[in-house]
From Swiss-Prot:
This is Serine/threonine-protein phosphatase with EF-hands 2. InterPro entries: Calcineurin-like_PHP_ApaH (IPR004843), EF-hand-dom_pair (IPR011992), EF_Hand_1_Ca_BS (IPR018247), EF_hand_dom (IPR002048), Metallo-depent_PP-like (IPR029052), PPP_dom (IPR013235), PPP_phosphatase (IPR051134), Ser/Thr-Pase_EF-hand_contain (IPR012008). It comes from Homo sapiens (Human). Residues 366-377, 737-753 have a biased composition (Polar residues). It catalyses: O-phospho-L-seryl-[protein] + H2O = L-seryl-[protein] + phosphate; O-phospho-L-threonyl-[protein] + H2O = L-threonyl-[protein] + phosphate. It holds the Pfam family EF-hand_7. SUPFAM superfamilies: EF-hand (SSF47473), Metallo-dependent phosphatases (SSF56300). Binds 2 manganese ions per subunit. Residues 21-46 form the IQ domain.
Length: 753
């Protein structure tokens, strides 16, 4: 008996030991599996973020380029000054005129066939709820109601301070939501899960309502409607995408014009004014600061509270180059003597030609001719006559135009015929934000937190700063606050704490990069101000996918975008690969491949980890780079029936070209008029120190107008660019037939191809 019992215990112990080892082995395998998935997820995330931030850098550089052209362009007529004012300056007079025009929304008829939601003011809760339901059913709000709602929204916003103060004493809880970026499903899901706004349920939406998603208009209408219904319980902060210059690139401008073709221009101009009246921050119980981006080491809440926020129409520029008339005159004379000796910003090459990126104009060159041959309609003036007019003119209308074009500063000598009160009134209206005020706003809208101490420029985004835990702690102590809530960054889980839990990032657009890429989140605060975070994914497809399927789907999308990026820089990559191929055998090591790719793309990605997904493995760890580039081209050409070199150029420049098109199309008509083209080309030719006749510019415009309807649309604009690239495959104007002809004829035309 004893022996049998002992044997049974021995076998039981062996079985238990074997089971324990098996469990440990399975656990080790599973942990490795999860670790590999996590590594893939992080690499995928890095790809999406790097490409997104690279696009933001391009936008900033492109706008800096146009701003530089404006600063060094000498207007030769009233038309040129007005054109600059329309495109580049913050035209308060035009906006006020447009608002008066929009107040006449009653003149817009709503047809009997219209089946969408109807609004009457003052709005009631049922109106706002009906809007949510109508947009859920894919109905569209009529332009009359859109303009009416925007007009009422502006009337409400102008009464609000720069920093809203709200309290948890008057509601059970306050819900803070982050970026929505035009994703209506997320907003509807938040209201479904958390409840519609009410006196007991307050909301703060922390900016970036628009761009990228397809339902930005609908989101704005819902948010504005609830803000009018519950002005004390529903609050909005401005984000960096509530900016008409940013909207030109990221889709909102295009969305409005597609949905409201007749009244789209009025809606966009009104929205531009509404955006600049949005509050900059919200303070809960004087303890929790909510702003879109972050803070910096110079953030001053007292100064932010006093800024005339409506003057900062766009954070992409600061029109505070306050120079005296004498300084402006000296600048004009210097430019007239030799524009080639003028200062060249960091984003332009040493030669005075336009850079190959973001814009290549190929061979649009012409023989230098006199400005006196301008067409009569331009009313051209030489530089000396313009200077004389700037010095001597005392007419109010001319002064206003010069103010808007940035040629004078407020506070100069007033005309004798005007009273001091009138002058002060006009000065207040035309006052531009100072550099300090502008930077305060840029920092709170564009900045990101970092783990290191200190504060440094945000070179990744191209605007704002990176702020460390010490900067956060300093601000919280200065104003006796507990923590800071910000948005601005997509997070895998929809939220993230940092800086010892003193900074909370909330991002409410789920599936932002791709279905399954990230969760959305919002945070609820009660009287104790303890953050309660709720996560979600609005897309039902994600609930049916396993973790591996979800990561694989997102990874595939990210790698596809990365291959497009690599293909767009094929020529640059080939040149860089050749530097590592000293023996000219067409082979480089995989380590050299990774170094070369990073030196060209500057994305900061873990290329060695991504290599297996991008490069076929080889036994000797060598890569035949020409065949690899050829395979990249085949992958893209399978989707596009365009020559490889031309497709590469379009992939690299399309976003910038579309943005340039919308900048030139200052009236948002969807077309560039011949006059807009002429004036813009004079801007370029002035920068490149090329005198070109207006007749030649008009011939060029007509040649781009392929269908001869008197306007240039986006397809014609891109096609002209493609043809120029086709005739100049290496971007060398000297090898282009057009450049040769230009020397003889004084103008060039893509239509000749």
């Amino acid at each position: 008996m004893g022996s049998g019992t002992s044997t049974q215990h021995h076998f039981a112990f062996q079985n238990a030991e074997r089971a324990f080892k098996a469990a440990a082995l399975i656990q080790r395998w599973y942990r490795r599996y999860v670790a590999r998935l996590e590594m893939r997820r992080r690499c995928t995330w890095s790809i999406f973020q790097s490409i997104e931030y690279a696009g933001q850098q391009d936008q900033v550089k492109l706008h800096d380029f146009f701003s530089y052209l404006m600063d060094h362009f000498i207007p030769s007529s009233h038309n040129d000054r007005d054109f600059l004012t329309r495109i580049f300056t913050e035209d308060r007079f035009a906006q006020d005129s447009e608002m008066k025009k929009c107040s006449d929304y009653e003149s817009i008829e709503v047809p009997d066939s219209y089946t969408g939601p109807r609004l009457s003011f003052p709005l009631l809760p049922d109106h706002a709820t009906a809007l949510v339901e109508a947009f859920r059913l894919k109905q569209q709000l009529h332009a009359r109601y859109v303009l009416n709602l925007l007009y009422e929204t502006k009337k409400h916003l102008v009464q609000l301070p720069n920093i809203n103060r709200v309290s948890t004493c008057y509601s059970e809880e306050i819900t803070v939501c982050g970026d929505l970026h035009g994703q209506l499903d997320d907003l509807i899901f938040i209201f479904y899960k958390n409840g519609l706004p009410s006196p007991e349920r307050s909301y703060v939406f922390n900016g970036d309502f628009v761009d990228r998603g397809k339902d930005s208009v609908e989101i704005l209408m819902i948010l504005f409607a609830f803000m009018l219904v519950y002005p004390k319980e529903f609050h909005l902060n401005r984000g960096n995408h509530e900016d008409h210059m940013v909207n030109l690139r990221y889709g909102f401008t295009k969305e409005v014009m597609n949905k409201y073709k007749v009244h789209g221009k009025e809606i966009l101009r009104t929205l531009q004014d509404v955006f600049c009246w949005l509050p900059l921050a919200t303070l809960i119980d004087e303890k929790v600061l909510i702003l879109h981006g972050g803070v910096s080491d110079i953030t001053d809440l007292e100064l932010l509270d006093k800024i005339e926020r409506s003057k900062i129409v766009s954070t992409m520029r600061c029109k505070t180059r306050q120079k005296s008339e004498k300084q402006m005159e000296e600048k004009r004379r210097a430019n007239q003597k030799s524009s080639a000796q003028g200062p060249i910003p960091w984003f332009l090459p040493e030669s005075r030609s336009l850079p190959s990126s973001p814009l290549r104009l190929g061979s649009y060159k012409a023989q230098k001719t006199s400005r006196s041959s301008s067409i009569p309609c331009s009313g051209s003036l030489d530089g000396r006559e313009l200077s004389r007019q700037v010095r001597s003119s005392v007419e109010l209308e001319l002064e206003r135009c010069r103010q808007q074009a940035g040629l004078l500063v407020t506070g100069e000598k007033e005309e004798p015929s005007r009273s001091a009160s009138e002058a002060d009134s006009e000065a207040g209206e035309l006052r531009k934000p100072t550099q300090e005020e502008w930077r305060q706003v840029v920092d709170i809208l564009w900045s990101d937190p970092m783990a290191q101490e200190g504060c440094k420029a945000n070179t990744i985004r191209g605007g704002g700063c990176y702020f460390g835990p010490d900067v956060t702690q300093q601000l919280l102590q200065k104003y006796n606050m507990q923590f800071l809530i910000r948005s601005h960054e997509c997070k895998p889980e929809g939220y993230e704490f940092c800086h010892n839990r003193k900074v909370l990032t909330i991002f409410s657009a789920s599936n932002y990069y791709e279905v399954g890429s990230n969760r959305g989140a919002y945070v609820k605060l009660g009287p104790a101000l303890t953050p309660h975070i709720v996560q979600y994914q609005a897309n039902k497809v994600t609930h049916t996918l396993t973790m591996r399927q979800r990561i694989s789907r997102v990874e595939e999308s990210a790698l596809r975008a990365l291959r497009e990026k690599l293909f767009a820089h094929s020529s640059d990559l080939l040149s860089e690969f050749k530097k590592h191929d000293a023996d000219k055998v067409g082979l480089i090591t995989l380590s050299d491949w990774a170094a070369a790719v990073e030196s060209v793309l500057h994305l900061g990605l873990p290329w060695r980890m991504l290599r297996p997904q991008l490069v076929n493995s080889s036994a000797d760890n060598m890569l035949e780079y020409k065949s690899w580039l050829k395979n990249l081209a085949k992958e893209q050409l399978s989707r596009e029936n365009i020559q490889s070199s031309l497709l590469e150029t379009l992939y690299r420049n399309r976003s910038n070209l579309e943005t340039i098109f919308r900048i030139i199309d200052s009236d948002h008509s969807g077309f560039i008029s011949l006059d807009e083209f002429r004036q813009t080309w004079k801007l370029f030719s002035s920068h490149m120190n090329i005198d070109i006749t207006d007749d030649c510019i008009c011939d060029l415009a007509r040649s781009i107008d392929f269908n001869k309807d008197g306007h240039i649309d986006i397809n014609e604009f891109l096609e002209a660019f493609r043809l120029v690239e086709k005739s100049c495959p290496e971007g060398d104007a000297s090898e282009c037939p057009q450049a040769t002809n230009a020397k003889d004829s004084g103008c060039s035309s893509p239509g000749a191809h």
